[in-house]
Design a protein with these regions (language model features):
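Catalytic core of nucleotidyl cyclases, primarily class III adenylyl/guanylyl cyclases
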Residues: 133
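Carboxylate/His-rich catalytic cores and anion/metal-binding grooves
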Residues: 111
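Catalytic alpha/beta active-site cores
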Residues: 1-96, 114-130, 138, 156, ...
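Thiamine diphosphate
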Residues: 136-152
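Conserved, mostly hydrophobic/aromatic
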Residues: 107, 158
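Extended amphipathic alpha-helical segments enriched in small hydrophobics
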Residues: 97-104
Length: 172
């Protein structure tokens, strides 16, 4: 996500995928209730992607991680239920709610049909829906309170497990 969303990275792509794979593999064996990675589409959306691209890139990143650990011999049901996602709440309420609801069905289909998941929890789209960033303005911090409430409403109607909203004066 750093490479796609920000054009920069700490490690090149392949070593990064290997490192995330190491984390997922370790957690599957030693900390099975821990969420080893939060797949992030948020930064990609903040970089100019539309809602469809945000979800698509997020799912492609998650698939790259899944492919890595499955190639090591893990079964999808050993880790998929603990993956989490970080997506952006921005814009039209109906479009955003539809995006998240469609994303849940699509992720379930990917995990079941492409990876052969058998456990229902492997199909869950566990997500944080965050709002702020590009949607807040420096010039009108009081109006950002309304924007934050609006983003929170979208997250709630979308069924997000977690939400992260910026403070009214956190515009950047």
């Amino acid at each position: 996500k750093e490479f796609i969303g920000r054009g920069t990275w700490f490690y090149p792509v392949q070593p990064s995928i290997k490192l995330v794979g190491d984390t997922i593999e370790y957690c599957a064996e030693h900390a099975p209730k821990y969420s080893p990675v939060s797949v992030c589409g948020y930064h990609i959306r903040e970089s100019g992607a539309n809602p469809v691209q945000e979800m698509a890139y997020g799912f492609c990143i998650a698939k790259a991680y899944a492919d890595e650990v499955i190639a090591r011999g893990l079964d999808v049901d050993e880790f998929a239920g603990r993956l989490s996602f970080n997506f952006n709440v921005f814009g039209n309420i109906f479009e955003q709610v539809a995006k998240f609801r469609a994303g849940r069905g699509l992720w379930a289909k990917i995990v079941k049909e492409q990876y052969g998941a058998r456990k229902p929890e492997s199909e869950w789209l566990r997500m944080l829906a965050g709002g702020g960033g590009g949607g807040l303005t420096f010039e009108q911090p009081e109006v950002n309170i309304v924007r934050g409430a609006y983003y929170g409403l979208i997250a709630a109607l979308s069924g997000a497990q977690t939400t992260a909203l910026c403070c009214f004066d956190e515009a950047y």
